[in-house]
Regions:
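Short intrinsically disordered terminal tails
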Residues: 1-2, 95-99
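Divalent cation-coordinating acidic motifs and surrounding scaffolds
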Residues: 87, 93
């Protein structure tokens, strides 16, 4: 396993059981499915550079969960803020559903 794969796995493990590593648009990313037709992609962290900031995309998926579109993007997220930012996006998705 390459060092950057180990770093990505450690970051994913640190975020918790709800997160997994997936290939999205030819990039190894961290993904979390919210279970409400929304999910997040944590991009830009498949590297050994600890100072590299993430870009987090909020996706809205279709009924089959095969196709989706990005409805919100949060850039320049430090690694120690990824979990908190994802929780904020979860709340945002729940608010969209309740409207």
């Amino acid at each position: 396993m390459k060092e950057k794969d180990k770093v990505l796995q450690a970051l994913c493990d640190g975020l918790g059981e709800k997160y997994e590593i997936m290939m999205i648009d030819l990039e190894r990313c961290i993904y979390r499915n919210f279970g409400n037709r929304f999910g997040v992609e944590v991009s830009g962290v498949h590297t050994t550079k600890q100072h590299k900031k993430a870009t987090i995309y909020l996706w809205c998926m279709d009924e089959t969960n095969d196709h989706g579109y990005i409805i919100k993007k949060v850039s320049d997220v430090p690694r120690n803020r990824i979990g908190k930012t994802v929780e904020e996006l979860y709340e945002y998705s729940e608010n969209l559903i309740s409207q």
